[in-house]
Amino acid sequence: MATYLEFIQQNEERDGVRFSWNVWPSSRLEATRMVVPLACLLTPLKERPDLPPVQYEPVLCSRPTCKAILNPLCQVDYRAKLWACNFCFQRNQFPPAYAGISEVNQPAELMPQFSTIEYVIQRGAPSPLIFLYVVDTCLEDDDLQALKESLQMSLSLLPPDALVGLITFGRMVQVHELSCEGISKSYVFRGTKDLTAKQIQDMLGLTKPAMPVQPMRPAQPQERPSVSSRFLQPIHKIDMNLTDLLGELQRDPWPVPQGKRPLRSTGVALSIAVGLLEGTFPNTGARIMLFTGGPPTQGPGMVVGDELKVPIRSWHDIEKDNARFMKKATKHYEMLANRTAANGHCIDIYACALDQTGLLEMKCCPNLTGGYMVMGDSFNTSLFKQTFQRIFSKDFNGNFRMAFGATLEVKTSRELKVAGAIGPCVSLNVKGPCVSENELGVGGTSQWKICGLDPTTTLGIYFEVVNQHNAPIPQGGRGAIQFVTHYQHSSTQRRIRVTTVARNWADVQSQLKHIEAAFDQEAAAVLMARLGVFRAETEEGPDVLRWLDRQLIRLCQKFGQYNKEDPMSFRLSDSFSLYPQFMFHLRRSPFLQVFNNSPDESSYYRHHFARQDLTQSLIMIQPILYSYSFHGPPEPVLLDSSSILADRILLMDTFFQIVIYLGETIAQWRKAGYQDMPEYENFKHLLQAPLDDAQEILQARFPMPRYIHTEHGGSQARFLLSKVNPSQTHNNLYAWGQETGAPILTDDVSLQVFMDHLKKLAVSSAC
């Protein structure tokens, strides 16, 4: 019998699913007492090189309110050619194509190893991929030049039949015609006036005029060229023209007086991009890619005025309700994001500037549409250039690692209901028998739209057990969930990926040990963290921390072993032992602590946390620390100030940053140049080892992390010192028998103090 850890890992590799609980409490009452909700992390398009898609359509349950897809959990009568749906128990006839099936000749979707299967839909014409570049021209010359080169490079990575468009903006917004041979022609819009989709389409001539009725000569072509073709052209037709056009882009000619910001019409430019695609390619996979080098300063969506002496809003301003433009700007971008999502398009934001660019107000554009958010200091850095290049990376079949216009549908057996989802999605408001009245995240529906996703995009799906306490589930009963993802593949095919999973029900009174052993503390920590971050968007920070603390105390009271009022007796089993320290680091993370971060930075961190898979999410919550020394090979060490020793090099991965830190002695040796002396070859290798490992992480991660090389006493050592558990501070540095390590100058409590308080509260009868 495989251990639960192996079972959890196998299921994640096969189905891209991690549940908080892998044995489910069999009644509503008991499930609410478990504290951590029954939920899962789902990676709908997890890469499976061993899973070739099947070239036929799925078989659906005939009950109109169910329509679940045939799967290995269904009961099959091979002689009568009938199958019983495992969700609603409807008996269904197999279609004629299945006439030859038998116990020894099963279709793939009935084999247990195909609990996840992908179908290629043959119906309907394939749709081309569409990329609409929206480019800020209020950049410094070297920044604009670097951006132009990156955009020209990206053209060579696109498939030849992809459609491409270009909008540029500064004080005015220009929509460039790409069909003119050798003539640059563009439509110019004022950057201060918002336009409706209808007005944009009328002005660009996208509404088809009535065709004049006249006899056609046989030689005349019967089809008029598409009205959209002036603005969106296949790359193979306009590759040279567009490369030249990008090369000729000039900085916005409008003069910027001293002490002023450039007039930047980001809100109108995005509005025109959304309106253009809305009128030409609704419900077709498309990416709007916004490149901006500063905050919107005029028109709808402006987040700050053009006076440089008035700084852009900070968290302090927001708390004091002193952010003048925030609410109106946020409303503008939310309206655009919802329109974009309704059309199945996604919006990426690439914001590179030293100051804030308005990501707080614009975050809903990528968050609701599944687009990317990239934040950097300049377009002329390897961080931006390599991150942008990785968007166009290919999979093992040579296809882009991106999918478009997806809908995710969740079906459950009758003892369960869907409470909601947290991730880069919007609700499709599909009510049904499996939709819970209690919402967690984006709820009130069993279907969500994810307009842009890749093989790592991960959603948190939350459930509610609705089975009543007095209606026991028979011994050995299993609950089932089916995830159905319809999407446009980057090869332009329509595909459906179906994942069907089941877990055992257990009676809490008699089988609590089984339920405990099947707790996945890593998945539970990430799922609870997602709930906390989701709440932090609308609630006060301290309230969210109090809520997380309360849940942790309740969980320890439920599953800890202890004697009342005796903290020393408190113990947690192995399947729960790491959970409190995940919560400790989560409380200190930039997702919940806004101190020392700008509103844009907080939005950026939260954006990535809401879409990454379990492994990356855990790194974000609790960074990984590796130690390099002469005492042995590199090894992971505790994220603790006691790990910072003079004769060590540390490598810390926080997901957003890779920090290499040289201990005091190592830094002195390096300054003395020992690594250049032949007799100290081993020291040279020691210095090189973390650089090689860091390079490996930098090559694989999206977005590319910020790379920081520092040493004891260096100003950037703060990145490491702010993350480690402050077990040694200026308060207890000289305690008797204290281990050597770096003292942290902080008033934050250490993990030890946090755990002592937790034990005290968990065992007290007052709680």
From Swiss-Prot:
Coiled-coil residue windows: none
CC terms in the record's Gene Ontology section: COPII vesicle coat; cytosol; endoplasmic reticulum; endoplasmic reticulum exit site; endoplasmic reticulum membrane
Cell compartment(s), UniProt: Cytoplasmic vesicle, COPII-coated vesicle membrane; Endoplasmic reticulum membrane; Cytoplasm, Cytosol
Record-listed N6-acetyllysine modification sites: K564
Family: Belongs to the SEC23/SEC24 family. SEC23 subfamily.
Subunit description: COPII is composed of at least five proteins: the Sec23/24 complex, the Sec13/31 complex and Sar1. Interacts with SAR1A.
The name this protein goes by in its record: Protein transport protein Sec23B
Name of encoding gene: SEC23B
